[in-house]
Amino acid sequence: MERKMVGMTKEQIVRTLLGGANCKNPATQEMFEENCISDSDARKIISELRSAGMPVVASLNHRGYWLASDEEELKTFLCRYRANAIERLARARKMEDGFYESMNEVLE
């Protein structure tokens, strides 16, 4: 794969890198950076691709991304993905509860 993908949009570059990646050779942040795509841009594009239904999975150790190659790979990732979402929702609830508790203390 060419280092610099000239004439392509950032999304096209991310799609190309993901298409050539797998669990043993994921698309890494270094690959994105070699193609002038920042970490935040890569994450945003990957989020948009996921929202569009593309099965972009990530390694446990945050080494990189690739397209799920089978149902088991996708299910394994989605289990972790959903667990993270549940943890974030619980944390958000605690933050909200803490805020209102502190507001009540101020008003008392």
Segments (PLM) and residue ranges:
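Long, low-complexity, charge-rich intrinsically disordered regions
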Residues: 77-108
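A short, conserved structural fragment
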Residues: 50-60
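Minor-groove-contacting beta-hairpin "wing" of winged helix-turn-helix DNA-binding domains
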Residues: 61-69
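Short helix-capping/hinge SLiMs at alpha-helix to coil transitions
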Residues: 18-24, 52-54
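Short amphipathic alpha-helical interaction segments
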Residues: 37-48
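Short acidic, hydrophobic short linear motifs in intrinsically disordered regions
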Residues: 22-34
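Short His/Asp/Glu-rich catalytic/ion-coordination signatures at enzyme active sites or charged loops
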Residues: 69-77
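Short alpha-helical segments that sit at the start of domains
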Residues: 1-15
